[in-house]
Regions:
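Structural preference for solvent-exposed beta-strand-turn elements
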Residues: 2-25, 29-144
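N-terminal amphipathic alpha-helix/helix-capping segment at the start of soluble metabolic enzymes
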Residues: 15-18, 125, 129-172, 238, ...
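Active-site mouth loops of central-metabolism enzymes
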Residues: 91, 152-167, 248-254, 306
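Acidic (Asp/Glu)-rich catalytic clusters
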Residues: 170-176, 202-206, 221, 241-244, ...
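Glycine-rich phosphate-binding active-site loops on the catalytic face of alpha/beta enzymes
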Residues: 179, 184-186, 232-240, 272-284, ...
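Alpha-helix-loop-beta-strand connector modules within alpha/beta enzyme cores
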Residues: 193-215, 232-255, 284-312, 345-354
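Catalytic cores of alpha/beta
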Residues: 211-226, 255-267, 299-306, 310-328, ...
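Histidine/lysine/aspartate-rich catalytic loop segments that bind and position anionic ligands
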Residues: 253-283
Length: 354
């Protein structure tokens, strides 16, 4: 008896019925793997609804004629595997592999279904084209999710300053455990900045750290940075978000509580608040102090990095008001030993032991 709502089929070559059955199984299983990641990993209801609909549509077309042709015991491909299947070491790799698996299976259904089951062929084609776009959305969301998880766990952001041994100093900081680097360079030319940004991007990838670029959206896109950090006078958040996309991080410098409130309603991922102490980098900006930092943290849902003149001698006052994220320049970049300086700052940021 055929599935409900399906008309009878004519005679189908058992070999064709068997491969249609196998590829329907393949498609539905692969869609479920992707669906569960979108549900539990990304919490994206929109993607889950679409994937579930595709599974149900294919299920309605999985006729008993195809299932009865199944013969797993005599399948020469049963149990075969490839070394590449063992290399899926993160959710994005699993999603990409299963999307590819489903797309291939749907193409098989489309080709062999044309002569025996036109409705199956047309549905397979429609789902295959839809999956091409959904795969991009899912992978972008997965990358964004991973970046934001790293951001949420980040306590120490290193902001660079030009120096002859830039790469070595950043490398030492990353080795010590710094998980976010912001490339800031107001001197030199764009070719030099591009070379630096490429090298720092690769270095951060090696250490599993975030790499964001100060001000320059074009440079961030050119090196595929994890995000961009903008000041109050830079592009509006909605314009910047439109340029960098949803997957990249967008940080915003803030100096007042009004700045914080405004950023909290926009598509920002994190804030820098400062300067908390007087600093030579921005001598025209008055220090906001620990109390203002505490007030800012209380009115925003976003991670807030205290910035400005922070070092081991004054960090205690920030910790006393609940600060657990800082961004520094000189405390690491000007240190005699950047690795040790980074370790000491990270140690200071550890939550107190009861």
């Amino acid at each position: 008896m055929e599935s409900m709502g399906e008309g009878p089929l004519g005679w189908v070559d058992p070999r064709v019925a068997r491969l249609i059955d196998a590829n329907l199984d393949r498609s539905r299983e692969g869609l479920r793997v992707v669906e569960d990641w979108c549900r539990f990993g990304l919490e994206r209801d929109d993607l889950v609804v679409q994937l579930k609909d595709w599974r149900q549509r294919l299920g309605r077309l999985h006729r008993s004629t195809y299932k009865q042709a199944r013969s797993t015991a005599t399948d020469p491909g049963a149990g075969l595997s490839h070394p590449a299947q063992l290399e899926r070491d993160n959710p994005q790799a699993v999603v990409a592999a299963n999307c590819g698996r489903v797309q291939e299976a749907l193409r098989v259904l489309e080709e062999y279904g044309r002569s025996v089951d036109p409705s199956l062929a047309s549905e397979s084609a429609a789902i295959r084209y839809g999956l091409y776009d959904l795969e991009v959305s899912c992978l972008n969301a997965s990358v964004a999710n991973a970046r934001r998880q790293t951001l949420n766990n980040c306590q120490l952001c290193l902001i660079t300053t030009p120096c002859p041994d830039l790469i070595e100093r950043v490398s030492q900081a990353l080795t010590a455990g710094v998980t976010m680097v912001q490339y800031r360079c107001k001197s030199g030319n764009d070719r030099e900045r591009l070379d630096d940004a490429k090298a720092l991007r690769m270095l951060c990838q090696t250490h599993g750290a975030l790499f964001v670029i100060n001000d320059r959206i074009d440079l961030a896109l050119a090196v595929d940075a994890d995000g961009v950090h903008l000041g109050q006078d830079d592009l509006p958040t909605d314009v910047a978000r439109g340029l960098i996309g949803e997957a990249r991080l967008l940080g915003r410098s803030t100096h007042t509580l009004d700045d914080v409130r405004r950023a909290d309603t926009e598509a920002c991922d994190y804030l820098g608040l400062g300067p908390v102490h007087t600093t030579a980098v921005k001598p025209d900006k008055p220090a906001v102090g620990p109390v203002r930092l505490q007030e800012a943290q209380a009115i925003t849902r976003l991670p807030v990095f205290a910035i400005g003149g922070i070092d081991l001698d004054n960090i205690a006052a920030l910790l006393d008001v609940g600060c657990r994220r800082i961004a520094v320049i000189g405390a690491i970049m000007a240190a005699e030993n950047p690795e040790r300086a980074s370790q000491q700052l990270l140690q200071a940021l550890l939550p107190p032991v009861d």
